[in-house]
Regions:
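Sequence context surrounding c-type heme c attachment/ligation sites in exported
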Residues: 20-144
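Hydrophobic h-region of N-terminal signal peptides that target proteins for export
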Residues: 10-17
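Generic cytosolic/nucleocytoplasmic N-terminal low-complexity/intrinsically disordered segments
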Residues: 1-2, 127
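Sec-dependent signal peptide recognition
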Residues: 2-8
Length: 144
């Protein structure tokens, strides 16, 4: 009973601390369509990264290259024009750098054929995702 009480108290304290945490990330104000596009791209990057990890587990470097290529600059160019003037330069640079990373992962998977090398590249690239998510939050502009 004492353990349960301690657990409940710790849970309440933890929740209280989290509720008071201030979100000091930069707010990016975009239209609902733009927000949907950005979030869709992020989900595509996440599912593509999972596909790369599955291929790496099988040591299928051809599949690694194919999945990485799909996340490269070709994917970025589809959205660049509609978002370029709306989003901060630093945000866009992080995104472009991540897409360039995937092109490099694809190239190296084809030429080097080393799953550990690819894992190191993927880990480094995911650091950009972390920086972005720690720095920005996306909000929809309110219609008048």
């Amino acid at each position: 009973m004492k353990k349960l009480l301690v657990f409940l108290i710790l849970g309440i304290v933890t929740i209280s601390c989290q509720a008071e945490e201030i979100d000091d990330r930069q707010v990016l104000q975009v239209t609902a369509v733009q927000r949907g596009h950005i979030l869709s791209e992020m989900r595509t990057l996440l599912s593509g990264t999972q596909a790369i990890l599955i291929a790496l587990a099988k040591e299928d470097m051809v599949a690694v290259s194919r999945h990485a290529k799909a996340l490269g600059m070709g994917m970025a160019r589809k959205a660049e024009n509609s978002l370029k003037g709306t989003l901060p330069k630093a945000f866009m640079q992080l995104g472009m750098a991540a897409h360039q990373d995937f092109d490099q992962i694809a190239t190296d998977a084809e030429s080097i054929h080393d799953p550990k090398h690819t894992l190191r590249q993927l880990s480094q690239s995911m650091g950009k995702c972390i920086v972005c998510h720690e720095s920005y939050q996306i909000s929809t502009l309110k219609s008048l």
